[in-house]
From Swiss-Prot:
Protein name as annotated: Solute carrier family 40 member 2
Gene3D superfamilies documented for this protein: MFS general substrate transporter like domains (1.20.1250.20)
Described function: Vacuolar transporter that is involved in the transport of excess nickel into the vacuole under iron deficiency, increasing cellular tolerance to nickel under iron deficiency stress response.
Family per similarity comment: Belongs to the ferroportin (FP) (TC 2.A.100) family. SLC40A subfamily.
Pfam annotation, one family: FPN1
Length: 512
């Protein structure tokens, strides 16, 4: 089994040169459709990344000197994704692409409009918490729920585009096409992560928080129509996507037919054995309950995921979400509390995303030479090394210097982080069957959200920004665990970690 896995992982790289020679004979992807896909994805990710950055600033403003509201939002968002992520993946599998697009885009943008409106209402009356706490609490809950629904619907779009459409569009082409599309998609996400915080930070610093919330709601209102038009154009313009949609519909109808046959075969014997049924009625009820639980969407999705060959890389990637060492809500709120200007935080987040963009350029070059599997291990431990700077900042007495060390360590680590992310995603695309892609993608995102939820729960427990150093150490320990798991996966497949005989200093030792 391990030898087969190694063969499958390295197959695309072993044949890379031969397929490059045949690339000219392959049908090329319609350029206009690829551009439409990228542009639609950019618009969708811009809104999601803007909200991701802004919500932490809104919450720390509404409840100063505490990470409580910020962490509470994170708990609601991550909790919803954890509970419903696998179900979202199965829903996508059971729906046509057009229905998924409508559900994703309408739900995401409508939720963001409501969240932006609720924030504006909170900011219009600065003393609302003391004047009318029930109204304040209601608006905060509305912000949390609508924001969480928006992020959950974004999950559907991420699974659809990153895990399905990109793979379908690249079928019949050389592996380099899939690698390039993965890199561009990740680059678009990181570009949004780079630019949206900078622009939002400038609006907040030089205009107002209220203006940023109004701008965000207006963006969601306008772009939903453009996004739908772009994605529908891609659907209609790429035959491979239409054919994949037809295969999905066929699988769905066959699955329903099998369930019907199974139900019939279960009940027919019962009609002929009524007396036996009465004697074992209570036991049958228990068995039926257990069967329903085992056959539920949630359990079957997780069972599917755990049976995949890439489960260890997936868990390693998910563990990286159990961290505050990113420009997420908790770290952003802490930096704001420490007195770092909002536009500086936005620029720092932008630099971090810029470093991540470099990963999308470096990854295709690296994986073509040493495979996605080995690229993953090298990129992971380079990220880990950069995070040592964040750990070192704990013992720096000057708060401003410590804050800038924290930001620098996080920003530098993004190169390794996003290369590792790309390496794991490509392994999933290579090794997960087409029929399981959306389900596995949904569970993967759910697992990531579960770990993110745990990080936010820690933020509630350790809500004083002065104690952020505790969260830093816990996060670093979790990242280390993720690296160990991925290294174990590498060793299981390759039976070794390094080619020690290729190291000059050890060459004589092996020769002797």
């Amino acid at each position: 089994m391990e030898e087969e896995t190694e063969t499958r992982v390295f197959l695309s790289n072993e044949q890379h040169q031969e397929e490059e020679e045949e690339e000219e004979e392959e049908p090329s992807l319609p350029r206009s459709m690829v551009i439409s896909l990228y542009l639609g994805y950019f618009l969708a990710r811009w809104g999601a990344r803007t909200w991701e950055f802004s919500v932490a600033l809104y919450m720390i403003y509404l409840w100063p000197n505490s990470l409580f509201l910020t962490a509470m939002y994170g708990v609601v968002e991550s909790g919803s994704a954890t509970l419903f992520g696998p179900i979202v993946g199965q829903m996508i599998d059971g729906m046509s692409y057009v229905k998924v697009l409508r559900l994703w885009l309408v739900t995401q943008n409508l939720s963001f409009i409501v969240a932006g409106g609720a924030v504006v209402a909170l900011l219009v009356v600065p003393d609302l918490k003391s004047q009318n706490f029930p109204v304040f609490a209601t608006l905060v809950v509305l912000t949390n729920l609508s924001g969480a629904i928006g992020v959950l619907s974004t999950l559907a779009g991420t699974v659809l585009i990153e895990r399905d459409w990109v793979v379908v569009m690249s079928e019949g082409h050389s592996p380099a096409v899939l690698t390039r599309m993965n890199s561009v998609i990740r680059g678009i996400d990181l570009s949004s992560k780079l630019l949206s915080p900078v622009i939002t930070g400038l609006i907040i610093s030089f205009v107002s928080l209220r203006a940023s919330a109004i701008t965000f709601a207006a963006w969601a209102t306008i772009t939903v129509w453009i996004e739908y038009w772009l994605f529908i154009s891609v659907y209609n313009g790429v035959p491979a996507i239409v054919q994949s949609d037809e295969r999905r519909s066929l699988r769905s109808s066959q699955s329903q037919a099998e369930e019907t046959d199974s139900a019939s075969s279960f009940y027919v014997p019962l009609l002929h054995e009524e007396e036996s049924y009465r004697n074992t009625q209570s036991r049958s009820r228990i068995l039926r309950i257990l069967e329903r639980i085992s056959e539920s969407s949630f359990v079957s999705a997780w069972r599917n995921y755990l049976n995949q060959e890439i489960v260890l890389p997936g868990v390693s990637l998910a563990l990286l979400f159990f961290t505050v060492l990113s420009f997420g809500t908790l770290m952003t709120a802490t930096l704001e509390w420490k007195g770092i200007p909002t536009y500086i935080i936005g620029i720092g987040r932008g630099i971090s995303a810029g470093v991540g963009l470099a990963a999308t350029v470096l990854y295709p070059l690296m994986q073509s030479r040493i495979s996605p599997l080995r690229t993953g291990v090298w990129s992971f431990w380079s990220q880990w090394t950069c995070l040592l700077v964040c750990v070192g900042s704990i013992w720096v007495e000057k708060e401003k210097i410590a804050s800038y060390m924290l930001m620098a360590g996080v920003a530098a680590s993004r190169l390794g982080l996003w290369m590792f992310d790309l390496a794991v995603i490509q392994q999933m695309q290579d090794l997960v069957p087409e029929s399981d892609r959306c389900v596995v993608g949904g569970v993967q995102n759910s697992l990531q959200s579960a770990l993110d939820l745990m990080a936010n729960l820690l933020g509630i427990i350790v809500s004083n920004p002065k104690d952020f150093w505790m969260l830093t150490l816990i996060s670093f320990a979790t990242v280390s665990l993720a690296g160990i798991l991925y290294t174990i996966h590498l060793y299981r497949i390759r039976k070794h970690l390094f080619h020690l005989e290729k190291i000059p200093l050890l060459n004589n030792f092996f020769a002797s």
